Amino acid sequence: AFIQTFEKVMPAMMGAYITKSDEELKFVKVTDKTSYQVAENSKEVAEKMKLSSHKNLEKILNKGIEEGESIQDVTKEILNGGIRDERYRARTVALTEMLRVHSYVANEAMMQCAVVEQKEWIHTGSTKNQPRENHVAMNGVTVNKNEPFELIGADGNTYLPMFPRDFCLPASECANCHCLHRAIVSESALGIAPEERRRMQSEYIENADREWEKELDMINYQKAVDY
């Protein structure tokens, strides 16, 4: 499953993001909430694309992430696999989902690093793509790492994503979005002893998992009530 591949490659992917901000930290684990969200999204994407089985898309995206394949390679496999006949649509799915995984990994790393205090939205639209004016306007916007950005959607609605391509955003704000978000390190926080920074990382993970357990119980309860 997609989540299994996500967990398999996480040490290398997330480790790189963590050490970029704090060389004293290493990958420990991904929080349960992030794992859950990525797994659920794999199914949702397949449903939106009206595929016969989400496992087909999972298999191709899994391979792309594990082997570091380019967007072009993943697109070709999606097309050759008969999942979607239209090239643009297939490329959009491959690109968006691979970048979305990296966004979640990057954000997870920021949250686990005590030296990271803020994050910045970076617009990196290609000249080959028609840039979204509302995303261009976000370039350089900085917020505290545990707070959402405020994005005015093309539909006029206000969204509060933690980063580009967050699951809370509609497809119209995610498809072919090349935006990134980067960590802003506090120089003063670098003065915290390495062992204390590692303790803070472990504490964050434990607290995040504990809070997610409560949140998941509420989600499951609501599903049972609605059913």
PLM region descriptions:
Residues 73-75, 89-93, 165:
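Extended, regular secondary-structure scaffolds
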